[in-house]
């Protein structure tokens, strides 16, 4: 595996390459004209540099992992097949990423310690995973994405105030949401095609107001008693009509690290299932 560290002083060393494995761009940045022959990066392209505008070489069509971890004001990745677009680090609050309307790859947030960049295009994406976020009480909004043609997962984060998906309408794969922060807003989400695992402690009128169908099994936690009441005070699924598999209401839900199926915790405060009043069919 070849690793090329590209500063302006050594960029001519990779002018003749059409295919390389990993390309790390730091410090002074990248002159894409010097990479005009580049067609494929089989491994990872890492950008940790600043620029007002950066468009990847026109001949580059295939890229396995693209890591963006510092502020480029406008980053154009249109026309490139990328398996994973990963946002990490800080300095992305003023970044705009320009992509195709249908992005077939996966978007992941991994050790993101600043704001999520703005997106242009990206009406549909292949998958979306939100890992650890070091936002120290900040919020994250992903506004453009309307459809995820695969799985969505949000792993446990306790240092985030809110997660907002104002435009998301459909997830065709599995939907996994694990955390204990106070605001999750999916106001336009109507359909989940696969399984839904939802382990959250707070609901409000913007959490899942329009979720109508889950294609396979659905599990969510209702809260439990352990030296006081824990978990959600209210559960809200006002539009849920159909669950294609098993519907499981569990006092304490699973985590990314364990199932929590046989903990012995009980819910002694839930008095009715009025939050499922629109439900018409299960299984």
Question: What are these language model-derived features?
Answer:
Residues 1-11, 17-37, 42-118, 124-141, ...:
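Concave beta-strand-loop units of leucine-rich repeat
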Residues 145:
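Substrate-binding/specificity loop regions of serine endopeptidase catalytic domains
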Residues 164-167:
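Intrinsically disordered, low-complexity repeat regions of secreted/extracellular protein precursors
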Residues 212:
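A contiguous, well-structured "functional interface" segment within a domain
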């Amino acid at each position: 595996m070849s690793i090329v560290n590209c500063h302006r002083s050594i960029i001519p060393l990779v002018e003749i390459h059409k295919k390389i494995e990993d390309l790390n761009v730091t410090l002074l940045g990248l002159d894409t004209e010097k990479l005009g022959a580049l067609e494929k990066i089989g491994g990872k392209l890492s950008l940790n540099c600043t620029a007002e505008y950066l468009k990847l070489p026109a001949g580059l069509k295939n890229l396995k992992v693209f890591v963006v971890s510092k502020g480029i004001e406008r980053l154009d990745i249109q026309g490139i097949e990328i398996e994973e677009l990963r946002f990490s680090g800080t300095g992305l609050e003023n970044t705009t990423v320009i992509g195709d309307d249908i992005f077939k790859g996966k978007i992941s947030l991994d050790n993101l310690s600043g704001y999520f960049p703005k997106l242009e295009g990206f009406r549909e994406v292949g998958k979306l995973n939100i890992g650890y976020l070091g936002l120290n009480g900040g919020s994250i909004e992903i506004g453009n994405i309307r459809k995820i043609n695969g799985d969505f997962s949000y792993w446990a984060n306790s240092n985030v105030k809110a997660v907002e998906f104002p435009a998301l309408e459909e997830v065709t794969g599995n939907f996994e949401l694990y955390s204990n922060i106070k605001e999750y807003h999916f106001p336009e989400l109507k359909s989940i095609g696969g399984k839904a695992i939802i382990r959250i402690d707070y609901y409000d009128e913007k959490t899942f107001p329009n979720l109508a169908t889950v294609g396979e099994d659905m599990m969510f936690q209702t809260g439990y008693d352990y030296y006081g009441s824990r978990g959600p005070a209210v559960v809200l699924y006002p539009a849920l009509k159909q669950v294609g598999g098993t519907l499981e209401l569990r006092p304490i839900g699973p985590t990314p690290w364990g199932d929590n199926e046989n903990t012995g915790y009980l819910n002694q405060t839930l008095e009715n299932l009025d939050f499922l009043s629109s439900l018409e069919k299960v299984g």
